[in-house]
Amino acid sequence: MRLPELRQRLRDHGAAPCHAGRVLRAWVAGRPLDNRRQRAEDFLPLRLRNALPGLFDELRNLAQVHSEHPGEDGSARLLVRLADGQTVESVLLPRDGVCVSTQVGCAVGCVFCMTGRAGLLRQLSGAEIVAQVVLARSRRPVRKVVFMGMGEPAHNLDNVLDAIELLGLEGGIGHKNLVFSTVGDRRVFERLPQSTVKPARALSLHTTDRALRRRLLPRAPDIAPQELVELGEAYARRTGYPIQYQWTLLEGINDTEAELEGIARLLAGRYAVMNLIPYNATEADGFNRPSWARAAEMARRLHRRGVLAKLRHSAGQDVDGGCGQLRARALDAAPVLARRPLPSAETPAASPKAAASIGFPG
C-alpha cells in the first residue's frame, strides 16, 4: 500500500483532512485513536469509524516480526515479514532510533554488502517503510529514523520521500532526526531541497579514490568523491544539518595512509561528520575489519587534521546482523564462499546514464 493510496482510502470513507491527520498520527505513534481530551466517536465520521478496524488490520499486516535478535550493545535486529512473504531487516538502535529498509534487495551491488547479492527484488511502499517504524515503536520509544537498512533509498525516491513527509509532519520526529542515506545519486540532491520535510543526509563514501569506489560500489553513479563532498556540503549549509559520511572500514583496502590523507584533504573544515564503521565480517566474503586500535588511531589522526570523525560500532555485530545477513540466513542463502575479488580496475563502471536507465518505479 502506498501512502497516497492510504490517504485516498481515508477520503473515500468520509475523512476530512483533520480526520485523516488524526488517524495517521495514531497509526504512526502506535497509539489508540481515543485520547484524554476526545473520543474517536465524538470526532470521526461514522462511516470512517466503521472502516477503520479493517484498515488497521491491513496496516498491521504490512510488517510483522519474523524473528528478533538482541545485541549486547542494546540494539536488536528484526527480521520483518511483509504481507507478501518477503522479508527485510530493521534495527532497533540503542538510543531511541530505528534503522529501516527501503527495498527488498538492492541494485547497487556493494561488494562488501550481503543485501546486494540477490539484486533488487522489489520496492517497498511508503506504508511498508513507515510500518517498520510503527513496529519499532511497539517495542521501544523511537525519536530518530535512519534510512540505512536494506536497499538504496535513491532508487525508491518517491516512496521514501512520502514516508519521510509522514514521519516528519504526523509522526512526531524532528526533521534532522530523519536521516536519508545514499551512495550518491544526483536525483537526491535535486529533490531533497524541494521537499517540505528536509531530512539530514548521510553519504556512503567508503573511499576517496574514484577508481576504487567504482570497484567497491560497482553500480553506483560514477561521481567523483570530491564532487560528492561539494554536493553534500551545499545541502548541509542549506539545511543547517551536518552531512554524515559513512566509511565501512575494510582491512588493507580503505584503512591505508593514503586514504587518511584523502579524507583529511576532502573533509577538513567541512560541515560534516565522518562515521568510521568497522566492517561486520561474514564467512561468505572473506573481507576483514581492521583492529579496533587501528580504527581508533584513524579517528584520532583525523581529529588532529580538522575532521570530526566518530568511530561507530555496527549495531548487531555480535549476532552477525550486518545488512542482509539475517535475511540471507533465513533464506538459507549464505553458503560459505571464497572471498569475492574486487572487480578489476579495467572493468567498466556503470555510468550515471546507465544507472539512471535501470527501472526504479516509485
UniProtKB/Swiss-Prot annotation:
Disulfide topology: 99-323
GO CC field: cytoplasm
Biased composition (Low complexity): 343-362
Single Gene Ontology MF annotation: 4 iron, 4 sulfur cluster binding
Region annotation Disordered: where it falls in the sequence: 342-362
One GO-annotated biological process of the protein: tRNA methylation
Free-text comment on the cofactor: Binds 1 [4Fe-4S] cluster. The cluster is coordinated with 3 cysteines and an exchangeable S-adenosyl-L-methionine.
Keyword Oxidoreductase: no
Protein's name in the database: Probable RNA methyltransferase Tbd_1951
Species per Swiss-Prot/TrEMBL record: Thiobacillus denitrificans (strain ATCC 25259 / T1)
